[in-house]
């Protein structure tokens, strides 16, 4: 897996020697010099299957830069992107950034699809610790359940939605937000989730494969690495 740190301090030793193009997935009309350099570095390094670890002050536009370079490479190499963060505020920033990226795309480029996922206990109602089942879909007949999940999956992938929106919409449809979001992951470009999906071995082994994610064919963006 490739590792792309979300922040960067530029130094002479890190100057790019590769292409100067910043790609097509830019969230803002203009870029700061540091942002542009980070995007170019990220694209060059990820195309070489390397990793970039870096640090920079708050507000420099690190999230937008890391996403721009990662999506550019992922679209060329058919990778998925995992954006790992432990902060709810960062989940929202990623979703808003992807919305901005999509709004700036040329019409011939397909929009970026993202799934925002948090822990099951926060997405489901009354999870039974013994059986692992939730009560989200109680009273829904099987034939209706699948069609409702399909509708909800389409909603998730149609545009970037924060996990709170997914939970609320799923409750209104009497469908499990957690299960439906996980089913949408195999068709998305970016999964926003917690660190434990990669760094806690038993969680990683059970979770990633169930969602159809091949870690060896994935670009990682690690928030606050």
PLM features per residue range, with description:
Residues 29-46:
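N-terminal pre-P-loop "Q-motif" helix
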Residues 51, 80, 190, 219-220:
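Hydrophobic "anchor" residues on beta-strands that sit immediately upstream
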């Amino acid at each position: 897996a490739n590792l792309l740190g979300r922040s960067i301090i530029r130094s002479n030793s890190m100057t790019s020697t590769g292409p100067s193009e910043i790609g097509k997935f830019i969230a803002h009309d203009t870029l700061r010099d540091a942002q542009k350099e980070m995007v170019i570095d990220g694209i060059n390094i990820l195309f070489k299957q390397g990793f970039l670890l870096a640090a920079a002050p708050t507000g420099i536009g690190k999230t937008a830069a890391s996403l721009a370079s990662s999506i550019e490479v992922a679209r060329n190499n058919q990778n998925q992107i995992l954006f790992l963060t432990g902060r709810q505020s960062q989940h929202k920033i990623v979703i808003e950034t992807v919305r901005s990226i999509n709004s700036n795309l040329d019409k011939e480029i397909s929009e970026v699809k993202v799934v925002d996922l948090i822990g099951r206990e926060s997405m489901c109602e009354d999870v039974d610790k013994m059986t692992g089942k939730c009560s989200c879909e109680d009273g829904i007949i099987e034939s209706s359940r699948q069609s409702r999940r399909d509708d909800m999956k389409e909603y998730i992938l149609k545009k970037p939605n924060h996990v709170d929106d997914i939970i609320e919409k799923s409750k209104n449809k009497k469908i499990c937000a957690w299960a439906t979001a996980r089913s949408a992951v195999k068709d998305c470009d970016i999964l926003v989730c917690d660190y434990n999906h990669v760094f806690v071995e038993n969680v990683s082994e059970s979770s990633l494969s169930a969602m159809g994610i091949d870690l060896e064919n994935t670009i990682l963006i690690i928030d606050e690495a």
